Amino acid sequence: MARGGRGFQGTVLKALRVPEHKLTVTGVREIPPYTELTVQCPSLLGARAAALPPTTWVRMWIPENGREYQRAYTLTRINRAQASAIILFLHHEPAGPASRWSSRVRPGATVAVQVMGGTSYRPPSPGDRMLLVGDPASAPALADAVDAAPAGSPVTVIMLAPETGHLPRAERDHQLIRLDPEVSEDKLLAAVDHALWADTGDLALDWVWIALESGVTKTVRRHLVASGMNRRSTQHQAYWIRGRAMGIASDA
């Protein structure tokens, strides 16, 4: 068990009486560049638990060397009957506490999680023409969003990801456009424009979700709004910040 408090964020969550849940790891699978954990938690994932919208992420308190590090990870493939879900940990260099923990964890291990502000996702309306733009960090959430899309909505996904390595994919039908992660900004925006405009010159999209590195996310969103997309139809969520860890450490 980690020693010490959980810092300011932990104090706020405690003051707001945000419930704490315990996830139990029941399965571990290596699918580079991810580690896939199957977890169970009746209080959060069971049949009587509150509904969780698509792309919901949990605040995980990752233990390491007597401290706890808060990191956010998306719950996917929720199975209410089994009170289970899948969490994918993307490995990168330099490795962080969550990446190291997922590499050494074994079935039977537990980890504390809380849910507060677990998603800003606004679901599309039936028939909306959808575009999602992401990368390996947000791919689990994008797959979850695509699987939850209305049956009559055509879906296009632009993914900045290498051709090699596992990439989480939705089971629902969708068009996937895979771009080199080092692609230039101009080429990324050109791919977005190709999805944005119909042959008639009219907008071909009703709903967009952008989930990339913080700076790139802002660039794509500004481009879409400048091109005529309604701001409320253009959602965005940065899944990482270049050169910075997304999370906090507990008090030592």
Task: Give names to the regions the model predicted.
Residues 1-252:
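Extended, composition-driven regions rather than compact fold-specific motifs
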